[in-house]
Regions:
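Globular "head" domains of long coiled-coil molecular machines
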Residues: 2-247
Length: 247
């Protein structure tokens, strides 16, 4: 199998890109793709012909044990399985919407599960007025979907951003370092932000000393299109943004 990880901070168009590559034939967005954070847990997109199309979900409570995701994959009864009807775009959307599921718990429970809780308004995870914290409902998801590229052995790892990368040890120690390629997705309308740099430097760029197969993708190029500019001016603007993002 060829493992390719898609990594991006929130609102970089990562889910939209995956939708365009794997689900364009449905004429609709199949993976949740809205402003803000949509992918709440690491999600593998693959195809295993021995199983029916489905999404397998590992409850977040499994982080309370010492077992890794790889170990949990050997125990089918630990996962919740939702069948997928690949003939219906609406049914696909309903099933895959689970990657956005959240649950509210008290601060002590969230911290026991390994989540870092911040007190500032800018913190990704923080205690709300009712004393609870919103965390992902699932630790990991595996989507079994019969796409031609997936049938040939391609496995896509969709990651949920900096906060999850930093709190799920298996992502930083195993899944990302062992991926054959990592696509780091930036948005043309934001360029390189400080959080983008943090993800790159700590988890992708030279992490583990491996540089081969690390690719930067500048997404949302259409945000630079302007009806009042000529094609040459738009091309020049895109080139400037590419130069600005390169490092």
């Amino acid at each position: 199998r060829l493992h390719v990880a898609f990594v991006a901070e929130f609102s970089r168009g990562k889910s939209e890109l995956i939708n365009a590559i794997f689900f364009a034939g449905y004429g609709n967005r199949i993976l949740p793709s809205t402003a803000g954070r949509t992918t709440m847990c690491p999600t593998e997109l693959m195809f295993d012909k021995s199983k029916a199309p489905s999404i397998e979900l590992l409850p977040i409570e499994s982080r309370g044990s010492n077992a890794s995701i790889s170990e949990y994959k050997r125990f089918a009864d630990e996962w919740q399985v939702v069948p997928i009807d690949t003939t219906s775009a609406e049914a696909m959307q309903d099933a895959l919407r689970h990657v956005s599921d959240v649950v509210r718990v008290d601060r002590a429970t969230a911290e026991k599960l390994g989540f870092a809780i911040g007190d500032s308004d800018s913190a990704v995870l923080r205690v709300d007025g009712d004393g609870t914290v919103e965390i992902p409902r699932w630790r990991h998801a595996v989507i079994n979907f019969p796409h031609p590229m997936l049938e040939q052995g391609l496995v896509i790892l969709d990651t949920p951003g900096l906060n999850a990368i930093g709190t799920e040890p298996e992502l930083t120690l195993s899944l990302l370092p062992n991926a054959h390629a990592v696509l780091f997705i930036l948005a043309a309308d934001t360029g390189v932000t400080q959080s983008d740099l943090t993800v790159w430097r700590e988890h992708i760029g030279t992490a583990g000393g491996r540089k081969k197969g690390r690719i930067v993708v500048l997404n949302k190029i259409d945000s630079l299109w302007d009806e009042l500019k000529s094609a040459a001016e738009i091309d020049a603007e895109i080139a400037r943004q590419v130069d600005t993002c390169a490092w």
